[in-house]
Amino acid sequence: MKRIAVIGGGASGLIAACFAAERGSVVVFEKQKKIGRKILVSGNGRCNLSNRVIDAARYHGKNPKFVNNVFARFGPDDTLAFFLSIGIPVVELERGRLYPASLQSSSVVKVFEYELARRGVDVRLHRKIESIKRGNDGFRLTTAGKETHDFDAVILAAGSCAYAPAGASSIGYELAASTGHTVREPFPAILPINIPNKALYRLEGIKWDVGAALEANGRTVARSAGELLFTKYGISGPAALDISRAANENVLARRSPVITIDLFPERSRDELRATLESLWSDANKPIAFSLAGILKERMPEVLCELAGIDPETRIAHAGAAERDRLIATMKDLRLQPGEPRPFAEAVIAAGGVPVDEIDPATMESRIAKGLYITGELLDIDGDTGGFNLQFAWSTGAIAGTAV
């Protein structure tokens, strides 16, 4: 019987093991005390399994169109059918996001535990693989405890270095490199954004619905909309997370990107001006105080400061230039992102093994025959909304079927 190792008990590794069990004797090596640690925290504990609308435009990397070949082999419909077959019906919620009907990540992990046992998969916890050696007859794996195990095929599903609280590390990249693969330098994606602006820090804790964009080299490279959370170091919330990958990529490339925030996306500039002019009818009011009815506490003073206006300036003394600057700040607040925040805070990591080194029909390495690489180890990362888990399910299922 074919001996198959799966390195990593995350999303792609678990589904790979389920399919591979039909083709041989499978052992899953997981360095943590429990499988599915990152699944447990996905979707804020609800497990955003996939998305109703999957296309290459929601993926990034050197060659994002790689996903088209992957999803042609095992796509969202195949994924939903698989989950239904193991007792996890799926429901669709906001923006096409798909979740287990239980709305609990823990139920997904429990079902996988049951399925692996039912299919005869040997799950070995607290087993960190430190080396892969290729030989004439397959692969020899060595654990951190110096145990050695021989296999005919290996599915490398160790995940990225993002989100250390769930046990993430760089070992997957190191193992891939040791077999001859190149690794594009990872960087954190989908996480809060540092903004080196002390005035902005005074808005810590405030949430506000905005339109946001990222500009680099004179063009808009990313857009988002939704809730923005001001923090003690910058910005977070869905509107920030959605542009964080582009922000970090351009910061690291030293392209001096700029984040633009529209605090009133539902109003045109002229409509906002008309609203403000009505609020400025009392010439004796301080200009910051005049905004108290349309902005949350602390926002008027900070926005005035960012616009270069003394918050105590009376309306009567605020000329056209000052008013124009304030309106511009409210409709086009321009912020310079700082260095990326740490991998420990990131949902995913961009970068990884170049996909031109992988056969999308099987996920087998083009460099090391018998080695399969899946999920976030590859140089493909998706937007928030179930796109990354879908890529993990698809690549894992393909590898498990092909091994």
Task: Enumerate the language-model features and the residues they cover.
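Glycine-rich FAD pyrophosphate-binding loop
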Residues: A5, A21-N44
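Glycine-rich loop(s) and the adjacent beta-strand/alpha-helix scaffold that form part
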Residues: A153-A199
